[in-house]
Amino acid sequence: MERVKANKGAPGIDGVTIEDFPAHARVHWPAQRAQIEHGRYRPQPVRRVEIPKPDGGKRLLGIPTVTDRLVQQAIAQVLTPIFDPMFSDSSFGFRPGRNAHQAIRQVQAYVKDGWRIAVDIDLAKFFDTVNHDLLMNLLGRAIADHRLLALIGRYLRAGVLVGGHLEPSDIGTPQGGPLSPLLANILLNQLDCELQRRGHRFAR
C-alpha cells in the first residue's frame, strides 16, 4: 500500500481516491480478499486518459482503481524477484536499482571501447500491442500458481472505459498500472536475449 500511496495518481472508474481508500477498504476489502484467495476476483476496467506527447500525438493511459492498483502492486512485488534475475544486464528500464543514468554510462563505455555507430530505436505503441497469448506463455514458464496466472489474464482483459463505453482489451497492457512495466520487461527480455545472441551492444 505504501508504494501505491507514494505513486499517488488519479482515481479509477469508481472515483475512489488514495485519500478515500482506507474507508473504502474497511467496507469492501474483506470480500475482495476472499475473492482473490478463491480465484473469483474480477478486476474493474481501467479509465482512459490521454496525455499529450511532445511530437503532437497522444499517449493513452489506463488508470486502474486504487484497489486494482494495490493488487497489481502486490503481484509485481511477488514476481519481480522471480523474473528480474533473468533480465539482461543491458536492461535498465522499470527495474529496481537501475535507471537511465546507468544506461547512459553503459553507452559511454561502448564509445570508449571503440563502437562508433549507434541506432536509436523506439518501440512504437508497444504497450498498446502486447500479445496476450505470448505474454501468458512466458509467465506460465515460471509461475506454477494457476490462480495467479488467471488473475493476471483477467487484468489484461479487463477492458477500458472510454466516455462511458466499455471497450474490450484483446491486445495490449495499459500504461498506468503498476504491473504493466514488469510485464513489458518480461516480454522484451526475449528481444534483449536475441540482441545479445547476435553480439550487439545495447542499452534498453
Protein language model regions, located:
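Short amphipathic alpha-helical segments
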Residues: 21-24, 67, 71, 131, ...
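Conserved polymerase palm-domain catalytic core
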Residues: 28, 32-50, 54, 86-204
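Duplex nucleic acid-engaging cores and interfaces of nucleic-acid transaction enzymes
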Residues: 66-67, 71-74, 100, 108
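Electropositive, glycine- and tryptophan-enriched low-complexity nucleic-acid-binding patches
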Residues: 72-90
